[in-house]
């Protein structure tokens, strides 16, 4: 079987899920191709704009999603859908040139382009969408994939309410790499991380981009720490956040 995984650079979570599926499929002897939507240049441009808006003007990002959510439905498409559909021609040529048997996408934008191709009668290859959010973000309801992998069953009601067909929803979780299945002794892990073996440790994570007011949360945690308690913060690729934490 020849499989295409289609992602986009708006945070590493989507790409990580795609790579995890790719790793599992390769172990089972499947041929895989991992592609960024629109190619590296377009993907990085879209991803860069997305990340800049989310990091620096989150209120504007929230407004865009709220307005889009009001417009979007299973029968009415949003401006986001039509913007993504501009990549349909390029993707159609790529799919036809490589004759894929199956397409998987961990990203909404790619799912919208594939939906556009399907509705134009240009796509007969089955499409599986992989959700990486623990909520139903706007615009999934305007996609038309053959199958949706959902992070957990508690999301089913929300997704169905938005208009996604129940028979296409499968709560199988978010794919992760094989490395997460490797069990290690806690004492060795603590030693590797240079943490006391008997201490209480609070882990703070906010995605690959280091979202949110993490520095304020950490400052409050540190203020209330006991003598045998530590805070470990995963900053992702947010160097500014790391610098702020190192100086506090």
Go through the PLM ranges and name each one.
Residues 20-97:
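Conserved N-terminal ligand/cofactor-binding loop architecture of enzyme catalytic domains
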Residues 1-4:
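Extreme N-terminal starter segment of soluble prokaryotic enzymes
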